[in-house]
Amino acid sequence: MKKASSQPRAIYYVVALQIWEYFSFYGMRALLILYLTNQLKYDDTHAYALFSAYCSLVYVTPILGGYLADKVLGNRMAVMLGAFLMAVGHLVLGASEIAPTFLYLSLAIIVCGYGLFKSNISCLLGELYQTEDPRRDGGFSLLYAAGNVGSIVAPIACGYVQEEYSWAMGFALAAIGMVAGLIIFLCGNRHFTHTKGVNKAALCARSFILPNWGWLLVLLTIAPLAIAVLFWQEWAVYALIVATAIGLAVLGKIYRQAENQKQRKELGLIVTLTFFSMLFWAFAQQGGSSISLYIDRFVNRHIFGYSVPTAMFQSVNAFAVMLCGVVLAWLIKESIGGNRSVRIWGKFALGLGLMSAGFSILTLSARWSAAYGHSSMPLMIAGLAVMGFAELFIDPVAMSQITRIEIPGVTGVLTGIYMLLSGAIANYLAGVIADRTSQSAFDASGAINYSINAYIDVFSEITWGALACVGLVLLIWLYQSLKFRNRPLAVGS
């Protein structure tokens, strides 16, 4: 007999697709900066610019992807189409080793696929439950854990295949993973018949000279080409400026629509959290760019005669997030009493403090490299693990606060704005920071020498920058704590 508490059968197909999507996305991401510098011979400045532009735009396109799913495609079709585009993009990226002109187009296709997939996979999962279904939270926890499994395995597998075979095979493995996830998902198609499908009436309705399905085909053709031009001409920053201006305008409109002081205070708290989260992720996203190149150039990666591929180090962060997340969920229970705002700022201070500690370890590693030529692998792993642990005190806290806001009908919009600023803008800032490590010179034989001092300076500055953020957050925390403590006295007087 089937237990009432068991999850719906369809969730396991969604989870399988999520695992393979994370495998595909993070497997490619672990290779990208190394591919640009080591294979295509981009200088660091050019590589950082393209890498940060790519990582920024993947947080912008989900806004359009969510709109298309709501109006025309439905979540299930949007997810399948997004998975297909990402698989195609990874295959084209592998071909760019032979024809570098495919590079910008492949990244653009992946960005479009990610936009259709990322904004709708969670919505599809939500469709599997009734509003008050007690299994809902467990389903989303399972989806989150599944993603971490994919992001742990991907850099190891893709890094190994790239090292042993070729760059094209590394990217092809990422594509194969996405195709495998899509096939598994399609095998469970019968379990999704109750979910929202394609809106055929909207798809066939005529707008101007074409039916909407015609406009959809035009969009799916033009969007990758337009994004490829943004990458090619390094115009992605202008797209970010436009998106940010729109996001801030919407935020201002929400603030004006707030009905009372409590709602405005809640919105102010979310804005402040978003600002500190943006800085946090500008520091944390060094992991895929400057830190990755530092490991490749200055860390002794040999163990028992085997050279550990640089891409594999990307798994450390994801493993730390998963392991520490399980431990925290077991050890920590949210207190019912006390001031929630005080607890929020305490967690943010801890997260930023751990980020500072992680970069202080990386600074020590870089100084070791300057003194002895190479740093040790355990020291590098320790720094990355601490940085991964720090993530648990930032995004979950901010997202929880957004879902609690009492202004009706704005949770989804605020989530999109949060992802725009803490994702897209933070990745752009991360590229600006990473570019400061791109100091190099040529020796007498014509070989390029990279400056370890540049890494020391940047890692040290991030350490102190994160620590300064901790100081600001602690001031806010202290103010909120004293304000809450004195409240009964004010009432009693």
Curated annotation (Swiss-Prot):
SUPFAM superfamilies: MFS general substrate transporter
CDD domains given in the database record: MFS_DtpA_like
Highest taxon above the source species: Bacteria
Membrane topology: Multi-pass membrane protein
Transmembrane segments: 14-34, 49-69, 91-111, 138-158, 167-187, 212-232, 235-255, 267-287, 312-332, 344-364, 379-399, 413-433, 458-478
Any one GO MF annotation of this record: peptide:proton symporter activity
Subcellular location: Cell inner membrane
UniProt cross-references to Pfam families, sorted A to Z: PTR2
Chief localisation class: membrane
GO biological process: protein transport
Cellular-component GO terms for this entry: plasma membrane
Job of this protein: Probable proton-dependent permease that transports dipeptides.
Family designation: Belongs to the major facilitator superfamily. Proton-dependent oligopeptide transporter (POT/PTR) (TC 2.A.17) family. DtpD subfamily.
HAMAP family: PTR2_DtpD_subfam
Name of the protein this chain belongs to: Dipeptide permease D
Organism field: Citrobacter rodentium (strain ICC168) (Citrobacter freundii biotype 4280)
